[in-house]
């Protein structure tokens, strides 16, 4: 039987960390105490104007490919999860394919599921590999969310950051990705959205992120707990067999509440929201790569990754690393 396992991870954060006090100095009506007490966020990274999602994705991808011990030309599938693509089209994945110098070698496409995008992309790639149609996939979450923030809205602009994370997923006789679960409920779309588009050369509607924070919190805590239990039950394993939980890094309170629902201590949770802020589809692979490189996540350990994003969309994956 063909399985899909993670062979390498990589990540990239642009520039220097931007603190809450830095935002205050830029004229944002907030304070370090206000942001930290409500979200746990202390810093985030903001890409310069000439850097797009494909640029961030390129560095993260190169690092993941190097960690996997393969060459770029060995990749025959690229899936990029992003809500902030470089262009309306072509896809960021095809731009990344070109920047990697891969050329005509397999498929490349984007997935848009906002903050759960990486879990969606990972699940899709795993299915491609298990089918036998592809052997080595590059799965990337990359975002420049700073481009869609209303910097006069202190309730949202302090929450988000830019970055990219990537994994190389390859065919293996040894199980890696054990189970995945994906869900969506579009009836909740007004709670978290960017309700605008481009038509006839003009921005139609509102081009900035809008969010009902309390509604997002309640929904996220419920579905993240549910979907984590779903992948554990599907694999027939208990929560106490999990070595690490890597949730979407939106808010430390959501992360703490999710861990509590699973009966896991925070010592088993990889939390980077304090350093990275909410990087949407990039948050999970960023946290994963950090924990791999600092030695917390080691071969043979069991990891749950999970995310929830606008739509709403949500999902989880159980992985033997």
From Swiss-Prot:
EC number: 2.3.1.180
UniProt xrefs under SUPFAM superfamilies: Thiolase-like
Localisation: Cytoplasm
Pfam families to which the protein is assigned, alphabetical: ACP_syn_III, ACP_syn_III_C
Any one GO BP annotation for this protein: fatty acid biosynthetic process
UniProt KW keywords: Acyltransferase, Cytoplasm, Fatty acid biosynthesis, Fatty acid metabolism, Lipid biosynthesis, Lipid metabolism, Multifunctional enzyme, Transferase
Active site feature: 115, 248, 278
Assigned GO CC terms: cytoplasm
Family of this protein: Belongs to the thiolase-like superfamily. FabH family.
Oligomeric form and interacting partners: Homodimer.
Protein name: Beta-ketoacyl-[acyl-carrier-protein] synthase III
Encoding gene per record: fabH
């Amino acid at each position: 039987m063909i399985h899909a396992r993670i062979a390498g991870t990589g990540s990239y954060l642009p520039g220097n960390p931007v603190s809450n006090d830095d935002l205050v100095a830029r004229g944002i009506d907030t304070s370090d105490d206000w942001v930290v007490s409500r979200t746990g966020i202390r810093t985030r990274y903001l890409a310069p104007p000439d850097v797009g999602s494909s640029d961030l994705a390129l560095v993260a991808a190169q690092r993941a490919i190097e960690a996997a011990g393969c060459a770029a030309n060995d990749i025959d599938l690229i899936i990029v999860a992003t809500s902030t693509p470089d262009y309306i089209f072509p896809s960021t994945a095809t731009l990344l394919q070109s920047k990697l110098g891969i050329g005509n070698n397999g498929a490349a496409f984007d997935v848009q599921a906002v903050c759960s995008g990486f879990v969606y992309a990972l699940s899709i790639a795993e299915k491609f590999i298990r089918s036998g149609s592809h052997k080595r996939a590059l799965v990337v979450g990359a975002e420049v969310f700073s481009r869609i923030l209303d910097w006069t809205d202190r309730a949202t602009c302090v929450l988000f950051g830019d970055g990219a994370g990537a994994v190389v997923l390859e065919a293996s006789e040894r199980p890696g990705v054990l189970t995945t679960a994906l869900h969506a409920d579009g009836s909740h779309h007004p709670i978290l959205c960017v309700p605008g588009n481009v038509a006839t050369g003009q921005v139609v509607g509102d081009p900035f992120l809008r969010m009902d924070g309390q509604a997002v919190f309640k929904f996220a805590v419920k579905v993240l707990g549910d979907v984590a239990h779903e992948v554990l039950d599907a694999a027939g394993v208990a929560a106490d067999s999990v070595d690490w939980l890597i949730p979407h890094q939106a808010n430390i309170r959501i992360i703490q509440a999710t861990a509590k629902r699973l009966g896991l201590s925070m010592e088993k949770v990889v939390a980077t929201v304090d350093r990275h802020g909410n990087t949407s589809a990039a948050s999970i692979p960023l946290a994963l790569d950090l924990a791999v490189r600092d030695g917390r996540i080691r071969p043979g350990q069991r990891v749950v990754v999970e995310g929830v994003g606008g739509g709403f969309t949500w999902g989880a994956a159980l992985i033997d690393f």
